[in-house]
Amino acid sequence: SAASDVYKRQVDELVGRTDLLKELPEAKEYHLDLSAILNNPYVDKKHPICYNKKNEYNFELEKTLDEKVLLTKLKTALDKKQKRSISIDVGNTDRSFGTIFGSEITKKYYNTLEDDTFTVQCTGAGGQSFGAFIPNGLTLELVGDSNDYFGKGLSGGKLIVYPPKGIRFKAEENIIVGNVALYGATSGQAYINGVAGERFCVRNSGATAVVEGVGDHGCEYMTGGKVLIIGKTGKNFAAGMSGGVAYVLDEDNDLYLSLNKEMVSSEPVVSKYDVMEIKDMITAHVAYTNSEKGKEILNDFSKYLPKFKKIIPHDYKKMLKKISEMEGKGLSAEQAQIEAFYEIKRG
């Protein structure tokens, strides 16, 4: 194909442009006749069949809820750095809700805002990429559910999702966010009162998340951050996980069946730090979502604690141990990390 040699800004600009295709010599060797595709008499370079220049880069951003509602209602608060909370209904066609407003926050204040400076209470079904890339200072609270890529690239913001009051099902047994939630998250918090789909927290490098169950390939390629799962995991959990920590409630003692052990180890929770970490994360989860499962665990914590497993990458565990040793010698946290890295590298 010659298409790769032609500068185009959108795939749409290539639609109908068979004049940009050329036949490779090998095609004739395999007796392939591509003339019906390449010799299209209806192709007109000036007026392509499907591509319409009028639609070029028209993403109709003015129709998004960010432009129509968030930037309108929160403009004064944004300009004056005032705390503000608003409510809004969302639908599953509202993609990347919060992202444009989040970009305006970042432009003005970078990551200097306090948590919950702007709180948006949403009701309904969140579209794809709900809360993607939202920064420090922005909290999105969703009563309902959300599609795939929930919290994609989370960058310091806070996401809370829980089902409406009066539901007749158990939240911890039902999916509330779709696949690939928190993909590539770098910082921030997410509290999910229900089950997430497949590939939860893939490439998470610094966010903290609490969820009540995940599908297959959870925490895949994770490099940092903390994840607490107070429910079941799907198969191939922690595949390629090289950093961060996952705490999993293994009530049926069968996590080993779904855990990918190539790069991680599973161990009981014994250190005081880990115990407090789990308790604090569940406490926050209950405070934000009113999770019944979370309350059940807190009310009988001594019973549930032995059922938790700590999933930690082998090399990450070595690094943490070495950093602790260096700090014990009086080095600062930053110096300890550097020295630990080089000492492990030297072997």
Stretches with model-predicted labels:
Residues A2-Y7:
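Short, small-residue-biased leader/transition segments that mark boundaries at the very start
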Residues Q10:
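Conserved, mostly hydrophobic/aromatic
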Residues V15-T18, A36-G347:
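Long, distal/terminal scaffolding or interaction modules
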Residues D19-D33:
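Short glycine/threonine-rich loop-to-helix capping motif typified by GTGT followed
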